Amino acid sequence: RRIFADALGIFSKPRQGFTFMPEDVRLSLISRRLGMLAQAGQYNLPRMLQRGDGAAAMTSTHEFTQAAISLVFLINNPVSVGYAPYYKWRFAALRRLSRRMATRLSGVCMQLEEMLRLASAACFGVPGTTAEHKASTTATPPADRINAIIEHICSDIVSELQREGLTRSQETFLEWQRPYVEEHIVSDAPCLHSL
């Protein structure tokens, strides 16, 4: 829907500049998301659950989820699919993106939603409210299921990085994938590389 006419492009031209993301920036952001996924989901969350710190575990779950959603949009190239939107619209946008043909990492949305359903029970020992949730949590503890989901997501991410030629490593701890992704960054600008 058109709100105003901009025949000369005075307003539209600068706005269009934001639709393009340089490849070096995209790769740098992918690397950063890999670092956050490793830190929040693979390293801190299991430690917080083991320690019994439900609030810290829930915070780690949130950070992992936000980084995973952002990474899915970055992998699918924001120029093609759009940027990850504001947090309250992220899952709706991720669901739409996941239903599109040829979407990379399309299964991440469903896995994240399952992880979030399990989070209350895993972090605070609060039983689920649905019969399906109660039945699904009796066999395997929710914390173990969340850790398995995280490892599955991370394995899928490594497979996608390999498919795109961004890594030659099999390592599923995502922090160790960062140097492989950053090898593809052409610019020497320090702001695009991890320490």
What are these regions, as identified by a protein language model?
Residues 2-195:
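Conserved nucleotidyltransferase catalytic core and NTase-mimicking acidic/glycine-rich helix/loop elements
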